């Protein structure tokens, strides 16, 4: 974006402000954006662009944030990969970890954690409730590092049935971790949940 990729120092002031203010950073694909990197590849064919942009742009962003050292230099930055499903995440993490021993010392000596450790500390990847791969993905990246996206008001959205679909498709324990994971992505803690419970009880 703005001719600067996500690991560029250009974005450091914005990352720092997000950390300081405790504000979540979210990635969303850019299939309709005039600056989309998919347009030079697929032109005006929206089918091509819609399929490719959701996973490819998310993967490009995660590679930049992990390998490019954004999470190393901004350790308190919380990042959500949103409205693009998430079954791509385990495979990409495995690929980064495969290359990590060969390239870290020569190309990314600033990294002090493994790729999976950065993901576990800084990342959440969203589901939309009806994907067949949710439970398998949760087993690979952790249900607590997942969240849900309603994808409203897009034409392929499951809104308003996202949470309902999630509860139908995975065991309740996994669904609970995913729902709480989303709350943690946006900085809510157990103390916030207790305050909400107390407020709701007071209204009753």
Predicted regions and their residues:
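Mid-to-C-terminal alpha-helical segments outside catalytic/metal-binding sites
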Residues: 68-69, 77, 88, 124, ...
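Short His-Asn-centered micro-motif
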Residues: 82-83, 125-128
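A short, flexible beta-alpha/helix-coil linker loop
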Residues: 1-2, 162
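Histidine/acidic residue-rich metal-binding segments in metalloenzymes
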Residues: 2-118, 133-144
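Alpha-helix-centered segments that form part of catalytic cores
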Residues: 116-126
């Amino acid at each position: 974006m703005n001719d600067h990729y996500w690991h560029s120092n250009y974005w450091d002031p914005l990352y720092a402000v997000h950390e300081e203010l405790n504000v979540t950073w979210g990635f969303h694909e850019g299939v309709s954006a005039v600056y989309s990197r998919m347009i030079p590849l697929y032109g005006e064919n929206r089918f091509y662009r819609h399929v490719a942009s959701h996973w490819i742009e998310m993967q490009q962003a995660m590679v930049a944030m992990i390998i490019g050292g954004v999470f190393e230099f901004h350790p308190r930055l919380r990042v959500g990969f949103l409205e693009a499903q998430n079954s791509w995440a385990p495979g990409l993490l495995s690929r980064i970890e495969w290359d990590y021993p060969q390239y870290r010392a020569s190309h990314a000596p600033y990294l002090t954690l493994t790729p999976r450790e950065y993901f576990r500390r800084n990342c959440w990847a969203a589901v939309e409730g009806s994907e067949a791969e949710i439970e398998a993905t949760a087993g690979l990246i952790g249900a607590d590092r997942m969240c849900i996206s309603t994808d409203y008001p897009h034409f392929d959205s499951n809104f308003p049935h996202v949470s309902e679909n999630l509860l139908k498709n995975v065991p309740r324990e996994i669904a609970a971790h995913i729902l709480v994971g989303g709350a943690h992505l946006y900085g809510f803690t157990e103390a916030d949940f207790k305050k909400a419970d107390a407020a709701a009880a007071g209204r009753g």
